Every structure is written in C-alpha cells, then in structure tokens.
C-alpha cells in the first residue's frame, strides 16, 4: 500500500459524506420550496457552493440525483412489503398506499417537471405491479378482462392524477388517497366481486 492510499481513502470518505449531506439538505429544502437554490442547499449541507457543483454540475443534475435517491428509498420500502405473500389485491393497495405516503412525505415529487428518465425510474415499480397483477389474475382476485400492461399504466396514471389533485388543492390529500384506493379497487376487481 502506498503512503497516499490512506489520504485517498479519507478524501473519498469526505466526498461521500459531502454528497450525502448535499442530497439530504436538497431533499429537505426542495420539499419545503421547490425553487430552493444551490446556495441555500450548500448552506444547509454545511458545504461550499463549489462543493455542491463539484458533485452536481447543475441544478438539473442535483434534482435527478434527489429523485434517484428517493426512488432508491421507495424501492427498499416496497421490497419490505413482501409482495409475494398474501392476497394480491391487498398487496397492490399496500403498494399504492406506500407510494402515496412517499408523495405526502416528499411533496417535491409532485412538483418536479416530467423528465426523460421518469419511465426508467418507474421501471422497478412497474415490474412489481406487473408481478402482483399477474399473480392476482392467476388466483382470480384481479380481472382478466384487461391486459396487465394496461392495468399498470392505469394505476400509475391514477396515482399521478390523485397526486396532482392534492397538490393543486382540488382535493384534500385524504380524499385524493381514498379516491385513488376506491378507483384502483374497482379497476382491478373481477366484475362479479365488484360492489
């Protein structure tokens, strides 16, 4: 090992800590105010603006990293739901509830402009919904009248619609969440089991 190796490791650890602090500060500030600037984020992270730009060359790059971090956290929470056990429809609703809680906890997610990477970020969530819906169709809990891809797209669109309704104060978050659950249930249930 060279004499410089411990110094390099220390610098890397410092850089990792700075990046983590910047992301945490950005998430907190952007949840409060979507137009929070890089200077304010640097202050909250207790780093210089130059350090922020060293990690994230633009505000768009920082926003993308924030969304990536929140997506990672969400996927960890989704995987903890143990989607392979229990009634499929119940698990779909649990997944919707978890996603809704993420939107409530991080309002910035509802305020960000649509990005080119959004479909890519939705990919893991889409895959979980697809597995659940296929399982539910096999067991007869979920309608077979509509294709899996259509049902997943409809669920995601409903989630975005509910989020937008809450974000623009057309509905309270509680009513939007209830409407989302009711609509999702009606969409997915076999016709014979609908109320």
Task: Please provide the spans of the model-predicted regions.
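Hydrophobic alpha-helical connector segments
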Residues: 65, 76-104, 116-118, 122, ...
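Conserved hydrophobic residue
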Residues: 35, 142-143, 171
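Alpha-helical DNA-contacting segments of helix-turn-helix folds
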Residues: 56, 61-70
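Amphipathic alpha-helical packing segments from all-alpha helical-bundle domains
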Residues: 94, 114-141, 146-157, 164
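Short hydrophobic/aromatic patch on the recognition helix
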Residues: 46-56
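C-terminal peripheral helix-coil segments that are non-catalytic and often amphipathic
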Residues: 1-6, 94, 127-139, 164-195
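Basic, helix-initiating cap at the start of DNA-binding domains
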Residues: 1-32, 38-44, 61
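Amphipathic alpha-helical interaction segments
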Residues: 21, 40, 61, 90-98, ...
């Amino acid at each position: 090992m060279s004499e410089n190796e411990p110094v390099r490791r220390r610098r890397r650890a410092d850089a990792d800590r700075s990046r983590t602090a910047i992301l945490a500060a950005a998430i907190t500030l952007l949840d409060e105010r979507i137009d929070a600037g890089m200077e304010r984020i640097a202050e909250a992270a207790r780093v210089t603006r130059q350090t922020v730009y060293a990690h994230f060359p633009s505000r768009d790059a920082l926003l993308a990293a924030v969304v990536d971090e929140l997506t990672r956290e969400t996927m960890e929470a989704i995987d903890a739901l143990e989607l392979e056990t229990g009634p499929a429809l119940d698990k779909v609703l649990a997944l919707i509830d978890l996603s809704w809680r993420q939107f409530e906890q991080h309002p910035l997610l509802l305020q960000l402009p649509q990005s080119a990477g959004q479909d890519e970020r939705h990919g893991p969530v889409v895959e979980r919904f697809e597995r659940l819906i296929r399982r539910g169709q096999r067991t007869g809990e979920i309608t077979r009248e509509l294709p899996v891809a259509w049902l997943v797209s409809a669920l995601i669109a409903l989630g975005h619609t509910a989020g937008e309704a809450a974000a623009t104060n057309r509905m309270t978050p509680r009513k939007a969440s209830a409407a989302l659950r009711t609509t999702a249930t009606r969409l997915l249930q076999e016709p014979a089991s609908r109320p």
